[in-house]
């Protein structure tokens, strides 16, 4: 498995969203309790029981991994692996924040790491003014 992209070799019981051979994105967040305040408010990454690929869950650069289908998604064929890889970590983290301001004319980015770099490109493409604070 390279850069959080996998080819589904086998599916667990009840998994119907993917077919064997599907090219699947496996993001860093790989599981959470689903019951706490954070999980109930779409902030699973802050859950005390959150599990992460490459930390508690083998993956990232492993040859094989087991991933919870809840957190995975099929990758469109138009994206090559190198194009999709940044979107599976920094892109997902940044997009969660961007959804809160996506209709704003101007947005501020505090810090300028990988997530902000990706979001600046999205915002610029959408004609938004960007203010970065580093």
Label each PLM-derived region with a short phrase.
Residues 1-37, 76-79:
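Glycine-rich beta-strand-centered segment in the early N-terminal region that forms part
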Residues 77-134:
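Mid-domain Rossmann-like dinucleotide-binding core that forms the NAD(H)/NADP(H) cofactor-binding site
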Residues 21-22, 39-41, 122-125:
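Short, glycine/charged-enriched secondary-structure capping and boundary segments
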Residues 5, 41, 69, 90, ...:
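ATP/adenylate-binding site constellation spanning eukaryotic-like Ser/Thr protein kinases
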Residues 28, 53-57, 67, 85-89, ...:
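Short, well-structured alpha-helical patches and their helix-loop capping segments
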Residues 29-73, 77:
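Cysteine-cluster motifs in flexible loop/terminal segments that predominantly coordinate metals
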